[in-house]
Amino acid sequence: MHASRRNTDITVICISNAIYGMTGGQCSPTTEITSKTLTTPRGNVDSPINVQALITAHNCFYGRSTTFHFNHALKCVFEALQHKGFSFVEIKSQCITNDGRRRGFKNSYEMMMSYKETYKINNNTNKLEHNEIGIIK
């Protein structure tokens, strides 16, 4: 947060699977509300942190993509690296072991393919909706 506030010339690439998957599947700051996890068996009561709002509040570069949209993700990373000042790329990723199966996915491929249906590319925006991927400069 301080780096974005100061517009430090660095690029952050965040692979976000919305869960602490390597330690058993605990709720994370980006876990969706009502999602069941190891630490929220009745469902998460907290809204996820709005990463986009945190980064764009300081007029910094923000890109969002998914593991399904590989070429788009590469474009986000390339443009972030070319950007002078702070840049942040959030790539939505799947965690089948500690999240996907709880949500009813049979395997990682099925979970990744859900990104194809869920996320749409928006090339002309100052704000991305929850189901949109794109770049805000």
Regions found by a protein language model. Name each.
Residues 17-19, 69, 92-98:
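Glycine-rich beta-alpha junction loops
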